[in-house]
Amino acid sequence: METGGLSAAALANGDLGSQRERTLVPERLQKREHERQLEVERRKQKRQDQEVEEEKSDFFAAAFARERSAVEELLESGESVERLEEAAARLQGLQKLINDSVLFLAAYDLRQAQEVLARLQAALAKRRQELQPKKRFAFKTRKKDAASATQVASAPDAPAAEGSLTSPPPLKEEGDFDSSWICGFSNLQSQVLEKRAEELHQQDVLLTQLRNCTIKLYGNPNTLRLTKAQGCTLLCGPVSTSVFLEDCSDCVLAVACQQLRVHTTKDTRIFLQVTSRAIMEDCTGIQFAPYTWSYPGIDKDFEGSGLDKNKNNWNDVDDFNWLARDVASPNWNVLPEEERRIQWD
């Protein structure tokens, strides 16, 4: 009887086990099918995203080429102020197109576009100078010699031979603007130097061979270069295109721009607003923080510069001397928050 009872119990348990397995099989199949559907959807979404990115890149390439061609044609035949102003307006549009495309453009394509834009900006500045050099520098409130309109202004109370720059040093990359570098300071030490909006508007500014100086640029330059500076503080309003920094040490900068390029520079802090990215090469001890300088009228200068004040990639830095993507570059770091509290004025 017991044997029969055990056999019956075993059979009953076996039936229950089989029933449980039959119940679990559909659950496993359903789970597997659900995972398969999720994977299909993920791949589909990935394909769609890729197609959207390709469409955006194609649109950018076509729009950029069209506007570039139009600007080049205007500059080649720019025998009137009106045509040059049209070229300037189109360049502002090109700049906005680049700014709006930063997130989906490949790094190489972005650099190429920025270099083309910088060259066109330089060509525009040169054509403006050729067409109306006197009118460009005839400021009503200035009390300088007429001769000073063709050279870089010297600092207050500094001899003209010391503070003015008549032949800028050779530039090593796309910033080679030659005679358009006609605004700035040079060969000065331990001075406070300033330029206002009417002097800076869409100018190419060159600051070179300065030591222990504080430079304040209240306005909207086209480009800005600081070279061979030591122990200087540079505060600048929004720069429409690029800021170049080279051969500098122990400096502090507050700059807003479309692109920042830093070469052969060390032990420098940069408070940055940049709509694309910062690029550095042959540098050490560089620290980055968000741009915090302000002055009356800066919002208007941002508007005129074409920069998006709400877009800031201050910590998106390409170090050309550091190719390892999974390890942070030892040549730069983010400035700690407790060290960012600076009273600029």
From Swiss-Prot:
Residues 170-322 form the C-CAP/cofactor C-like domain. Keywords: Acetylation, Chaperone, Cytoplasm, Phosphoprotein. It is found in: Cytoplasm. Coiled coil: none annotated. GO terms for biological process: post-chaperonin tubulin folding pathway; protein folding; tubulin complex assembly. InterPro entries: C-CAP_CF_C-like, CAP/MinC_C, CARP_motif, TBCC, TBCC_N, TBCC_N_sf, Tubulin-bd_cofactor_C_dom. Its main location: cytoplasm. Residues 18-50 have a biased composition (Basic and acidic residues). One of its GO terms (cellular component) is photoreceptor connecting cilium. One of its GO terms (molecular function) is tubulin binding. The modification Phosphoserine is found at S80, S167. Supercomplex made of cofactors A to E. Cofactors A and D function by capturing and stabilizing tubulin in a quasi-native conformation. Cofactor E binds to the cofactor D-tubulin complex; interaction with cofactor C then causes the release of tubulin polypeptides that are committed to the native state. This is Tubulin-specific chaperone C. The gene is TBCC.
